[in-house]
Swiss-Prot record:
This is Large ribosomal subunit protein bL33. InterPro entries: Ribosomal_bL33, Ribosomal_bL33_CS, Ribosomal_bL33_sf, Ribosomal_zn-bd. Keywords: Ribonucleoprotein, Ribosomal protein. Pfam families: Ribosomal_L33. It comes from Treponema pallidum (strain Nichols).
């Protein structure tokens, strides 16, 4: 079996339309809190806060 690494894949979910527009990775050892970024949402056509969500 593969070893579990500290880097995990996450999705960034729009707080306005609740869609998952972006995927990225983060290191669990370096970043303890949930990731929040202002990114462009093509469905709302503006920059909106995106929060970290698990990839299903």
């Amino acid at each position: 079996m593969a070893k579990r690494t500290a880097v995990e894949l996450i999705a960034l979910q729009c707080t306005g339309c609740k869609r998952r527009n972006y995927t990225t990775s983060r290191n669990r050892r370096n970043v303890q809190e949930k990731l929040e970024l202002r990114k462009y949402c093509p469905f709302e056509r503006r920059r909106v806060l995106h929060r970290e969500a698990k990839i299903k």
